Amino acid sequence: MDKKAARIRRATRARRKLKELGATRLVVHRTPRHIYAQVIAPNGSEILVAASTVEKAINEQLKYAGNKDAAAAVGKTIAERALEKGITKVSFDRSGFQYHGRVQALADAAREAGLQF
């Protein structure tokens, strides 16, 4: 099993458990160059809030979009947007990525900005 297949297998298992809970989830995806975050409704078919380093407003503030500082900026932005929509509590879906580095930086920044998970 290659690295990508193993990550997808981990993500599928975690998503199955989160679906049983019926909670709003904060989904994170990372690539070497960018990081993306979405808040998805409990039914799984509606994206309530999104933020990423691809967005011009976030990317202009950054020197490079693929590091911890960029992830923290996305985490802060996603939390602010979620709180504006009245979403305070989410379940964290790391998409099979290790909770370390950029994924952890995004989660910590979102917590500091007021999102609970």
Swiss-Prot record:
One of its GO terms (cellular component) is cytosolic large ribosomal subunit. Keywords: Ribonucleoprotein, Ribosomal protein, RNA-binding, rRNA-binding. SUPFAM superfamilies: Translational machinery components (SSF53137). GO terms for molecular function: 5S rRNA binding; structural constituent of ribosome. GO terms for biological process: translation. This is one of the proteins that bind and probably mediate the attachment of the 5S RNA into the large ribosomal subunit, where it forms part of the central protuberance. Part of the 50S ribosomal subunit; part of the 5S rRNA/L5/L18/L25 subcomplex. Contacts the 5S and 23S rRNAs. NCBIfam families: L18_bact (TIGR00060). Belongs to the universal ribosomal protein uL18 family. This is Large ribosomal subunit protein uL18. It comes from Yersinia pestis. The gene is rplR.
